[in-house]
Amino acid sequence: MNMTQARVLVAAVVGLVAVLLYASIHKIEEGHLAVYYRGGALLTSPSGPGYHIMLPFITTFRSVQTTLQTDEVKNVPCGTSGGVMIYIDRIEVVNMLAPYAVFDIVRNYTADYDKTLIFNKIHHELNQFCSAHTLQEVYIELFDQIDENLKQALQKDLNLMAPGLTIQAVRVTKPKIPEAIRRNFELMEAEKTKLLIAAQKQKVVEKEAETERKKAVIEAEKIAQVAKIRFQQKVMEKETEKRISEIEDAAFLAREKAKADAEYYAAHKYATSNKHKLTPEYLELKKYQAIASNSKIYFGSNIPNMFVDSSCALKYSDIRTGRESSLPSKEALEPSGENVIQNKESTG
């Protein structure tokens, strides 16, 4: 063997070793686990992140993600209970595989477990949902419930079939429906929108009317309360005036009563005093005192009898009667007026 052949052999050996090393060394990313197959059999020891060595061409590996990942299911057909075929453009399933469940799930469902456990299950559950509802319900009324219903159905089956695989969320895009039906739905939605706007306007008007009514009620109650307070104030003022008047009347009545009582008492005392004072002897004394103090002299037949004693009065009347009988009358002594006139005429 010459030098050239030796060099070629060494180069071949080095190349073979390099190829073997390249084939045996592999890298696992963070958030992944490596499962190994040797001769088609799954090995029981997954490897974590980092560089690892395996037997080239005999042992193979698959990287399995153990962090959150999103699987997309596209263009899923769905037939409603009315016979209308619709298509859902995309369904996103956010899931996470626990590291402790990697070996069992890969052994039972292969490293492409998501196709078996998620994709096929999505098709089945979605068709079950659509076949039980009408297009109106799927497209409008119950569309907001599809996400939650799919999530619950998937998680319920996974808890039995693949413990450790958790569904975090399901997002479903709006279904694609035939163009004619879509236009009808758009028109219907437009009419619904107009109806909702009209209903909201009516509610606003009713609310404003209710607000105005409440304002009017509050204003009326305020006016009524003010009037009531003023009325009560006037009533209190009148009651106060009445009370003052009653007090003044009572005081005046008490004063007048006391005055009348005093006058009555004084008159009663005066009468009692006069009763004891005005005896016949005292009255006789006062009469003579009055006569003695009187300077007037009365002549004629009309002298008051009250100033003459009764015995003297009788004697005076008898004397006067006798005198009048002895004297001629005045008419006889004096000539009458006619005789005097006749004598004057005869004389002339």
Curated annotation (Swiss-Prot):
Topological domain ranges for the Cytoplasmic compartment: 1-7
Taxonomic source organism? Homo sapiens (Human)
Q: Where in the cell is it found?
A: Endoplasmic reticulum membrane
Q: Does the keyword rRNA processing apply?
A: no
In residue numbers, the region (Disordered) covers: 325-348
Its recorded name reads Erlin-1
Disease per record is: Spastic paraplegia 62, autosomal recessive: A form of spastic paraplegia, a neurodegenerative disorder characterized by a slow, gradual, progressive weakness and spasticity of the lower limbs. Rate of progression and the severity of symptoms are quite variable. Initial symptoms may include difficulty with balance, weakness and stiffness in the legs, muscle spasms, and dragging the toes when walking. In some forms of the disorder, bladder symptoms (such as incontinence) may appear, or the weakness and stiffness may spread to other parts of the body.
Q: Which family does it belong to?
A: Belongs to the band 7/mec-2 family.
Subunit arrangement? Forms a heteromeric complex with ERLIN2. In complex with ERLIN2, interacts with RNF170. Interacts with AMFR and SYVN1.
Name the gene behind this protein: ERLIN1
SMART domains per the UniProt record, alphabetical: PHB
Any one cellular-component term (Gene Ontology): endoplasmic reticulum membrane
